[in-house]
Amino acid sequence: MAHASTHPAHPLPPVAPRRLLLAQRLLRGEGSVEVTAFRAGETLTTAVHGVSADGRLVVAHVPNLLGSLGAFHTPAPLDVRVDVLRDALDLTLPTRLASVHLLGTLRWCRDSAEVAELGLRGRVADLVADVGPRVRVGVVETQRILLHDVDGVAVFCCHTLPLTSRGLVDQAELADLADDVLGTAPEVLADLADAVALGLLPGESTPLQVDTELLPESPANALDADEAGVTLLRVRDGESTAVHVALPGAGRLDHSPRHAWRRLLDAIPARVAHP
């Protein structure tokens, strides 16, 4: 994603790899995107986003008679704010998992040949294939990216946040993992969260400021799942905690998140599951 020509004078604090992965996922196409031309005060809320083959942030929009591009209809580079919002995996939770925010410059592709050179994948590629030349596709250049998640705020420079799609875990595998996690009994999810809190399984816990009266009556719910681990919302004694449970084998070339999740369930310590 492009890419400041100079590095910042003061290096940014390091960020946990799982948060880096979350920011990458959102920018690669997860969640919903809003693109605002902040000088004109206009916002595209029906755009889709993803990345090019070389890791640049791409947005696409289909103008129509009811929702034209307005201030976005310009061949000149446009100053924009991009917001990507991602809800919790369990949609019964009134909780947003994370959001990514950036200021940058949007430049629309001039023709279909320039779009083809981007090497698009995912939802943006599907939209271009389905709608054809009516789709406006643009590339967003930025220097810094802000991530808001359950751990707080993290700031990334683009050169530390590679977005190329090469080497990604198969999306069907991750969809199956999400289904498996959502299909796991809340009591079992609670056992996993408690095992992390007791130091019996690898992971991290972060207290949350959430009104537990607004949450479902469940000891634990799924906030997120990816190749690195599963993030759970644990509610106990009127307090809520986000617990990231690391998946065994994450980072290995033969890593299967779905199989790792099953191994993790088998590894729940007996003293947690059967006190």
Language-model-derived ranges and their functions:
Residues E30-V33, D54-R56, P77-D79, R134-V137, ...:
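Short, surface-exposed beta-edge/turn micro-motifs
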Residues T36-A40, L85, L233-V235:
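A generic structural motif
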Residues L57-H61, L102, R107, G138-V140, ...:
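Short hydrophobic-aromatic micro-motifs
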Residues A2-H73:
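An N-terminal domain-cap segment
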Residues N64-V128, S240-V243:
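Short, structured beta-strand-loop surface elements
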Residues M1-H3, L120-P275:
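C-terminal edge-of-domain segments
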Residues M1-L12, G50, V84-L97, G167-G183:
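N-terminal short leaders/motifs
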Residues T43, D54-L57, L97-S99, E227, ...:
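Coil-to-beta-strand transition motifs
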